[in-house]
């Protein structure tokens, strides 16, 4: 949902800039352009997803959305040929376990925003494999086994963003701010 929202904002900016250039607010105008006015790109999106089918679905959804947004841009900026093909590889979307993946090998150092929706599993609902992943992320810290599974994403995000200007937002339950896990997380 983030990509179409960003492109919608960008289209508004393109339309406003075009209106300022031509003096024709709200009217389509012919301005000869050498370069595409589009700056928000699928190449700026990165991701790690454990489910291969979900990766394929995400790529297909992004390709469809890109085409839809380029058509809307074409309505504003009629003189530029927004060619959708060939499809981009979307190689920045990685299939893998986010807790076992070195994020510095997937995400660029100058990443602006890190947004995620990690799985919520209380300490008593984790499989042996998930518990082992959690303990590995927390380097076996005392009481780490009592942390909600999504807490491991917070730790990975904190380590990845340390010393960087990257802002982070993760969807999670309020349980990560309660009980024994508070000491290890916060």
Regions from the language model: what does each represent?
Residues 1-186:
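SAM-dependent methyltransferase catalytic region
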């Amino acid at each position: 949902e983030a990509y179409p929202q960003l492109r919608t904002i960008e289209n508004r900016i393109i339309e406003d800039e075009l209106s300022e250039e031509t003096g024709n607010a709200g009217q389509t105008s012919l301005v000869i352009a050498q370069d595409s006015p589009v700056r928000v790109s699928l190449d700026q999106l990165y991701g790690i997803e454990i489910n291969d089918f979900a990766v394929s679905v995400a790529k297909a959804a992004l390709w469809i959305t890109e085409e839809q947004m380029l058509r809307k841009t074409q309505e504003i900026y009629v003189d530029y040929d927004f060619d959708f093909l060939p499809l981009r590889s979307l190689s920045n979307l990685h299939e893998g376990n986010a807790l076992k993946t070195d994020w510095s090998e997937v995400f660029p150092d100058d990443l602006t925003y890190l947004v995620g929706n990690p799985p919520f599993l209380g300490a008593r609902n984790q499989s042996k494999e998930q518990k082992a992943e959690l303990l590995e992320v927390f380097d076996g810290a005392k009481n780490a086994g009592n942390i909600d599974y999504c807490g491991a994403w917070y730790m990975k995000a904190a380590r990845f963003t340390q010393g960087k200007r990257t802002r982070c937002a993760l969807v999670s339950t309020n349980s990560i701010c309660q009980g024994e896990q508070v000491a290890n997380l916060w």
